[in-house]
């Protein structure tokens, strides 16, 4: 066991986690040169294209150190984006140590600090790595200072590397062996294994990625999931070395895969503890937290014929993505669809892109919303994330919305505009903390609903790309949320209703009305488009009618003839306005929902 090292790589987005992992894999001969490609641990096309890691991944590497000893290195790759922090948590629980990667030109950023706190929470040994030293803008000494001041880690242990050129990779491998601790655990104790990930194989069902904490696991063992309370029989187990390599047993300290005839990810809970059914452990591994959906949105197929395809596609996606939830939903305007729960906006974006790409389904997605807690006057409470189920305002006593604690790292010259941006997004308390020279940490409490739309994009724009942002959910607080209905020709359109803070309701309603006025074709009669809270109209635009020249056929003659025809047209238009239906094209919905802004 003393020759095993379980470690993960944690860093801010774009600091070079996946490239460093590639170099470690190459140095240890994890794959042949012919099989190698960039971003080895990123299995989805969308991960490679966007250069982001979405799903945790694992690989077992064999390394012979300079002292001649052979080591087994289990590298657990982790996503860097705040949406997938629950994946990071589970990966950290499976490790004893972590490589803390910092970009030599960018320095310490918000998620570096957030991941540091997470790693310390799980009591991991950290080895700082300064990456991208081949860049012209690299400043290793400055970054060493930041590692010391901002992170409180020993700057002299930090290893300068260039994952791109391969410089310093051997030092990292030696550093892992020397500085990171070996796992502890008793192979003879009752089995305790942590399921930190799972993926679906169409021939073998769900393949579980596990870290054995205590005990030993063998094929044909009957295993019990402690949180899900389900039993399965192990068919096969072994190491993941880009292909599954079967072994006779997995013992305490090892990381490997288990095939146990599990049909879908929904049958088990990721983060669960496995034990033996005939010799169970007393209690599960502590620290288990189910994934929490924070963003909700309705997803409709472009054409109603694709509803069955959408159902199958969501079922297939959720086999691999346990954090995606969905339930049936319908709209008078858009037909049948699903109300889906996501971990954040990037998760929504990734699911949307995968549905369109992998399953070739055109989608209309409603404006994302968070879950509000409503206390009614009769003393009951409701959780509502869909405007359709918003209760009558006269019955509501109070509404609470989720708040987050945002941690923003910026160069000090941008502090004014960033504070203003936070205030625009209804930030409540702001504190500033000076880090190393010229850098500030702004901590702010603000509603999650305000961060959903464009906060991150605006922050990047204001700080010219230097600002970084991370958040943790804190609590629900009372607020003044209203439901705004959009009426076209005095008829409410359910798919366009949204929930918003009263102060921002008019601006957003005006934006919706203007977008619709551009997208809906003109009719023979005047069409009012209104935004209303209850019975009060707060915004309005009008689509002007076509005018047919009914007097064109007259040639000379009396003026009363002309008046008679105009009068007849006026009556016809009044009748049409009363009974005529307005046809709202699909592209009108898409244009409104896509360009949604505050």
UniProtKB/Swiss-Prot annotation:
Domain tr-type G: 2-184
Gene Ontology biological-process entries: positive regulation of translation
Compartments in which it is found: Cell inner membrane
UniProt-recorded Gene Ontology molecular function terms: GTP binding; GTPase activity; ribosome binding; translation elongation factor activity
PROSITE patterns: G_TR_1, G_TR_2
Pfam (any one): EFG_C
Residues reported to bind GTP: 14-19, 131-134
EC id: 3.6.5.n1
One cellular-component annotation, GO: plasma membrane
Record has Protein biosynthesis as a keyword: yes
Cited HAMAP family: LepA
Record's function text: Required for accurate and efficient protein synthesis under certain stress conditions. May act as a fidelity factor of the translation reaction, by catalyzing a one-codon backward translocation of tRNAs on improperly translocated ribosomes. Back-translocation proceeds from a post-translocation (POST) complex to a pre-translocation (PRE) complex, thus giving elongation factor G a second chance to translocate the tRNAs correctly. Binds to ribosomes in a GTP-dependent manner.
Family according to the record: Belongs to the TRAFAC class translation factor GTPase superfamily. Classic translation factor GTPase family. LepA subfamily.
Protein name as it appears in the record: Elongation factor 4 2
Native species: Rhodopirellula baltica (strain DSM 10527 / NCIMB 13988 / SH1)
